[in-house]
Amino acid sequence: MLAELEGDGRLVLCDMEAGLGTVFRLKPAQLDIVVVVAEPSVKGIDVARRAAAMCASRARVVVIANRIREPADLEAIRAALPEHELIVVPEDPVIARADREGLAPVDL
């Protein structure tokens, strides 16, 4: 399906299942950017580092430093993935509250 959507000026953003199987089934020409989400934990950073290393030869890798609570969280991710562009998403207690209450964050 993605091959049908190829062309200049087109953007397809896929939120795929966890893991790299889907990425590796695509042809390198079908990928421009792979977004890797890194959580600030030992396991989260390790998984992100492995994913970024595996994808770097196939596409540009952008890392989302997700749920950042303090500077040390960001520094740990930055130290593990220094060669990649980094986008920071801070921890937001409204998201957790909305999830607990079964609401959309904008409804709080």
Can you say where each PLM-predicted feature lies in the sequence?
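Residue-level detector of flexible, active-site-proximal loop/helix-junction positions
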Residues: 92-93, 102
